[in-house]
Amino acid sequence: MVEASEGTLEPIGAVQRTLVGREATEPMRADIRLLGAILGDTVREQNGQQVFELVERARVESFRVRRSEIDRAELARMFAGIDIHQAIPVIRAFSHFALLANVAEDIHRERRRAIHVAAGEPPQDSSLAATYAKLDRAQLDSAMVAEALRGAVVSPVITAHPTETRRRTVFVTQHRITELMRLHAEGHTETDDGRNIELELRRQVLTLWQTALIRLSRLQITDEIEVGLRYYAAAFFKVIPQVNAEVRNALRARWPGADLLDEPIVAPGSWIGGDRDGNPNVTADVVRRATGDAAYTALAHYLAELTACEQELSMSARLVAVTPELAALAEDCAEKARADEPYRRALRVIRGRLTATAAEILDRRPQHELDLGLPPYATPAELRADLDTVDASLRAHGSALLADDRLALLREGVRVFGFHLCGLDMRQNSDVHEEVVAELLAWAGVHPDYRSLPEDERVELLAAELGTRRPLVGDRAELSELADKELGVVRAAAHAIRRYGPAAVPNYVISMCRSVSDVLEAAILLKEAGLIDASGPEPYCPVGISPLLETIEDLHNGAAILHAMLELPLYRALVAARGQSQEVMLGYSDSNKDGGYLASSWAVYRAELALVEVARKIGIRLRLFHGRGGTVGRGGGPSYEAILAQPPGAVNGSLRLTEQGEVIAAKYAEPQVAQRNLESLVAATLESTLLDVEGLGDTAEPAYAVLDEVAVLAQRAYAELVHETPGFVDYFMASTPVSEIGSLNIGSRPTSRKPTESIADLRAIPWVLAWSQSRVMLPGWYGTGSAFEQWIAAGPQSRAERVDILHDLYRRWPFFRSVLSNLAQVLAKSDLGLAAQYAELVDDAALRRRVFGKIADEHRRTIAMHKLITGQDNLLADNPALARSVFNRFPYLEPLNHLQVELLRRYRSGDDDELVQRGILLTMNGLASALRNSG
C-alpha cells in the first residue's frame, strides 16, 4: 500500500492542511510510502491479487473521502456483504499500516529533534535543557529549592488496558522495524552485520503479517503482568537510571550545597496484579505472581549486567592499582585463573552474593547465576555499597570513563529498582472494605452490625480498634469467601514487603472513597496483615493509604475528608511515621463519566486547590496521584502541559500518574521515546514546583469564578443527554461496540463493577473506548460548547466583553489553555460522518434521530465556541504534529470503522461465526493502535 497522491484534494472537517513545513515532513511521508509499499507487496504475495486490489480500492476511496469530503456511500457499499474470509485480511492490512505509520511518525519526531539540536536552536519546551534554562533565569534560593524538592518523586504507574494486549512477538517485531527504519533515516543501506535494510524490513513485515495480532482466549492477569514488565527490558532499565543521574547531577551543579535528590526522582509503579476493584480475578496468588515476577525481572537484569561488566573490566593488577576496599572485596573470589584480575574477581563476588539473594527470595532461578557459597545481600543497599566500591576504585585510578559506562547504569538501576523493580499498588472499592470489616468486627465480637452505625460512631469504633495491637481474627476463623480473599490479598502484600522490601507494595488505594470511615476500614485490613501498628510510641506503616476521589461530589468533598482524617490523632501519627506525607488520588475517568469533560476537569482543579490548603494548614506534605487515562475523556492529553496546568502548590516536587493502554506503548516502547517522555514529566514537575506557572496572580479568584459558572452549565448540558434523555443507554449500547467489549476476549476485568447496564456502574475504560471506536469521542467534549455559549449570552456584560474575558483566560492561564487544547485534539479525532454509520445500528429510528441529533448539534456548537475563544479557525493550529498525523494517517482508519460497523451488524443479527467475532476484535485493536489513546 502506497500513499495516495494528494493533488488538489482538500482536508475534511475542521482540521485544515497547511503547506507550511511540507518540505520538512517529506522524509516522514517517504517512510510511510516505503513501509506501505512493503506491506502492500506482502498482502499481494500472501493473500493474492484479489485481496490486494480490495485493499487498494478501499485505500484510494478512503483518501478521497478524507481529502475531498465526498459521500462515504461507496465505502459502505464496498464492505456490505463482504465475505468474512476477505474481510479479515483487509482489517489486518489497515491495522498493520496503523502500526507501521506509528513507527514512521516516531522516527520523524526523532529526526526533527536531531535537526533542531544540530541547528543550535534554543531547547524546546518540555525538554530538561529548556527547564534548566528557566530555573537559571529565576535565580532561585538554594534553601527554597532543597525544601521544595525534599522527597521529590515522579512516578508513572503502569496499568492494564483491554486494547494494549499485543503479544511479545508483535512487540519485538515492531521494535526491530523501528531500529531498521532508524538506520534507514540515518542514510544507511545495511545493518551493522551487513544485512540489506530494505530486505530485512521485508522479512520483518512478513513476520508481522504471519503473526496473530491478538490472542484467541480472554486475556489473563498473568498476560497483563507480562505486558507491563516488557517495558523494562525495552526501555526502562536503560532510560530511568540515565534520567535520574542526569537530573541529580544537573541540579546539584546549580545548587551544590543543597544535597538534592538523595533518592531517585523517577520511580516507576504498577497496578497490574494489585488492582482488584471490580476484578474478582486478582487474588493472593496473583499478588504473589506480580511481585515475584517483578523481583525476578530486576535480579535477572542485574545478573546479566554483572556478567557483562566482568567481561569488560578485565584490568590486570600488574597494570592498574586498586583501592584496599576493592582488593578486600575481591578476596572472597579465590579463583586462581583470575588472580591477576581484581575487578573481575570483585564482580564475581557481587554476582555470587546476588545469586544467593535470588535463591533466597525468588521462586525461579534466573540466568547468569554464579554459586560461590557466599551469603546473600540482606538489602539492595548492601549490593549498592559493593558496586560503589568498584566505582570508587575505578575513579581513584584513572578509569572514570569505564566507571561512567555500564557500571554507572547498574548502580543507578539498583538505586531505583532495588530488589522489587516497581511498587505494586493495592486497590479495592470502599464498599468491599465495609462489608469485610463488618464481618471481621462481628466475628471478633466487637460489634454485631457495624454497617448500621452512623459515620461518627464508625470512626470512633475503628480508631479504637486501630489503637490495639491484637488482630480481629486468627488464621482459623471461619469467614466468608470474600473476607478470606481480601485478607489473603493483604497478607500476600505483607509477604512481598518482607521478601522484597517496603517499596514492593508502597500504597493502598481506596476506590470510591467518600468518608473517613472508608479510610479507616482499609487501615483495619492492613492491620490484620501486620502492615499497620499504631499502638506503640513509634507507629509502623510501610503502606500508605490513598483515598481516591472519583465522582464530582467526592471531589467537592475531598478536602473535608482529608481534614477530618488528619484531625484523628491516631491517623495523624501514621502520617508522621511516613515522613509527614499523605497521598490523595484524583479520579479523572469516573468524574468525567459522572459530569462530563469540563465539569470534571474543573472539579479536579478545585479539589486540588482545597486539598493543598488543608495540607498547608495542618503541616503535612501532600502528594497527588492523578488517575489519568489515555484519552482526554479520562484525563489524558500531553503530560507536560497537563502538569503545568496544575494549580499552585499541587505538584510540590512529587507527582504520580497512571499510564494506560496504547499510551504506554506510544511513550515507553522505544528508549529514545521513553527518555523524551520521562524527561518531559520531570521537566514539568520541576517547573511547576519551583516556578510560578499559573500566571494569574491577583486575578485568580475572578478566573476561578468564571470556571465555576461554566462548569455548572457544562455538567447540566452533559447530564441532560447522558442521565436524563429517555433511551440514551439503549442508544449507547446499540451505536457503539460496548457490549462486544464485554462479551469478546478483551481484558481480564469485567466491563462493569456490577451486573447492570447502568452508566454509573459501567467502568470508565469501556465507556470511553466505545465512544472512541465509534469516533464520537463524546466524553472528551460533550457539554462544553453549550456551556460556553450559555455563559457568553447570560452575563451582565456584552457578548463581546464576555468573549474577551474567555480569550484573556486562554492567553494567560495554562489550565484553561490546556482544557481547550485537549478539547481541540478530541474534536479533531472525532468524525461525525463515521459516527452516523454507527448510529444506523440503532433500530429505533426516533431514538436514533433524537440522540444523534443532539450529539451532532453539540459537536458543531463546540467547534464554533473553540474557534470563538481561541481565535483559531483550525482546531490543531497549535499542534502541527497531530495535524500531520490526522491528515496523513486517519484515512487508513476509514475501512476499519466501516468494517467494524458491518461485522457488528452481522454479529448482532445472530451470525456466530468465530471469524466475525475475531474480525470485530481486530478492528478494535487496529483502531486503538491507530488512535494511540482510545481508552
From Swiss-Prot:
- Disulfide bridge positions per record: none
Coiled coil, from the record: none
Record-linked InterPro entries: PEP_COase, PEP_COase_bac/pln-type, PEP_COase_Lys_AS, PEPCASE_His_AS, Pyrv/PenolPyrv_kinase-like_dom
Q: Which GO terms describe its biological process?
A: carbon fixation; oxaloacetate metabolic process; tricarboxylic acid cycle
Q: What is the catalytic activity of this protein?
A: oxaloacetate + phosphate = phosphoenolpyruvate + hydrogencarbonate
Where does it sit, as one GO cellular component term?
A: cytosol
Q: Report the active site residues.
A: 161, 593
What this chain does, per the entry, is described as:
Forms oxaloacetate, a four-carbon dicarboxylic acid source for the tricarboxylic acid cycle.
| Protein name in the entry | Phosphoenolpyruvate carboxylase
